Amino acid sequence: MSSAGDWRASLDALPVPVYTTDADGAVTYWNRACVEFAGREPELGQDRWCVTWQLYTTSGEPLPHSECPMAEAIRTRSEVRDKVAIAVRPDGSRRAFTPYPTPLFGKDGAFVGAVNLLIDVSEEQAEALAEQASRCRRLRQATTDPQAAQILDEMAKGYAENAAALRQSRPVFKAA
C-alpha cells in the first residue's frame, strides 16, 4: 500500500472501530465501525483524543477524554495496553472496550499522531461485574457489622446495575 488512499480504504473495510489523531490529539480520521460503536459521528478537528461521547472507568468514575488511553499514548509517545474503559453513547447506552492506542511516526522519526483500535469487551466486563456483585453479597452474608453490611449491599447493587447496563446495550463487535 503506497498511498494514503490505499490505507484509508483498508481501514474503512475493517469491521472494528479504528481512528487516528494528529500529534496534538485532534481526531483526523475514523471508519464507519467507529460511528456505529460510539453512536455518534465525530467532529473532524474538534474532537480530541476520543471518538466517544463520554468515558468512564470500569469502577464507574468519569474518565475525562484528556486522561483516556489515547491521550496517554500521545503524551508519552508510546503504546498503551491492558486498559478497559466504558464508552457512553448519546442515547445513554454503554459499551466496555479495550483500546489499543499506538503512536505514529513519520519517515524522519518525528511523531505525527496516533492510531487507535477499539475492541468491544462488554460481555466479558458484564460477567466480571456480576461476579463482583456476587462476591459482595457473599461477604455481606458473612459479616455481623451493620455498617460493613450496608457498604457491601451498596457495592453489590452498583456492580449489578453496571453489569445490567452493559448487557442491555446490544453488542456491536465481539472480541476475537
Regions found by a protein language model. Give the residues of each.
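Sensor-regulatory modules in signal-transduction proteins
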Residues: 104-106
